[in-house]
Amino acid sequence: MMKRNILAVIVPALLVAGTANAAEIYNKDGNKVDLYGKAVGLHYFSKGNGENSYGGNGDMTYARLGFKGETQINSDLTGYGQWEYNFQGNNSEGADAQTGNKTRLAFAGLKYADVGSFDYGRNYGVVYDALGYTDMLPEFGGDTAYSDDFFVGRVGGVATYRNSNFFGLVDGLNFAVQYLGKNERDTARRSNGDGVGGSISYEYEGFGIVGAYGAADRTNLQEESSLGKGKKAEQWATGLKYDANNIYLAANYGETRNATPITNKFTNTSGFANKTQDVLLVAQYQFDFGLRPSIAYTKSKAKDVEGIGDVDLVNYFEVGATYYFNKNMSTYVDYIINQIDSDNKLGVGSDDTVAVGIVYQF
């Protein structure tokens, strides 16, 4: 019974923060470094070669490694930094050996007492403060939190100010302001102009509410894309959650303008949706003996796409479960019941996908 009760406490902490189970490798004279990571043996099952599926087909094994460090400069001022890297384990040792390997996070900053923290580097955009509420599925999910896409996912060149508990005056009231620096890359998909975003959230006794917004200039290359016009990109999202008594419920609604990447597989053209409307719902329950079932629904619809009109980008029901042997070892299955029509005008995959994984994390 003791083991069951411990799992009921540990597992939610692991879900909220990937570094909750980190191994402390140095702690001396006000300097601390924690190492964290995981190895995931993962396989997707779908029809054929997975080209018409939600997520693909075959071996998807990967590993991640990161560290978090902090140094106590004085009684009020703390310096900190974090780095995280992804290693694909489904590559050969030949020409594709480095495919998919990438830096996920790399930033450093300062925190001063109740005034807040300020950091710069590659970090999460502030709109993910809302989208993170529903990015909780065993394998899938987070479908609208694209990386290198303005403010909704991990992105480079962001300066972020965060304040917790409103200067120490209101418990649970948090806000953030973020500046996104220009990233003009070779591809329009992962570029952006200068922008500013912000988020505000409040949590009380397991309930949470959040709103986030970001707007940025688009690069010349983005404005010249075949799909999606306009000089500004906008993204906003709201979220509600309940996280208490072993129950997790969350919902997001959000919209974007000239910001969500799309590709027409039939015409081989790409760009951005003029507008999207996004709905994400998640429900999970943590049993004391380690089982965590999950059900979810996600729909992202693009509006007014050139030559097409309205079209689904993502549309599925999810059923899955994770079983935690202990704080370090787990296994899961995640099933996507795809609701995309087979005649989708962008050629978005319509087949179902099942993921089966086993995880060691520290």
Curated annotation (Swiss-Prot):
Top-level taxon: Bacteria
**One Pfam family matching this protein:** Porin_1
Q: Known Gene3D superfamilies for this protein? A: Porin
An example Gene Ontology biological process: monoatomic ion transmembrane transport
**CDD domains the record matches:** gram_neg_porins
- Whether Membrane counts among this entry's keywords is yes
Q: Where is it located?
A: Cell outer membrane
Q: Which UniProt keywords apply?
A: Cell outer membrane, Membrane, Signal
Query: Mainly resides where?
Result: membrane
User: What is the topology of this protein in the membrane according to its UniProt annotation?
Assistant: Multi-pass membrane protein
The keyword Amino-acid biosynthesis is annotated on this UniProt entry:
no
InterPro entries linked to this entry = Gram-neg_bact_OMP, Gram_neg_porin_domain, Porin_dom_sf, Porin_gammaproteobac, Porin_Gram-ve, Porin_Gram-ve_CS
List the NCBIfam families hit by this protein, alphabetically.
PRK10002.1 (NF007446)
Self-association and partners:
Homotrimer. Forms mixed heterotrimers with OmpC; other mixed heterotrimers are also probable.
PANTHER family per record: OUTER MEMBRANE PORIN F-RELATED, PROTEIN YDDL-RELATED
| Identification of the protein by name | Outer membrane porin F
Q: Origin organism of this chain?
A: Escherichia coli O6:K15:H31 (strain 536 / UPEC)
Upper lineage: Bacteria, Pseudomonadati, Pseudomonadota, Gammaproteobacteria, Enterobacterales
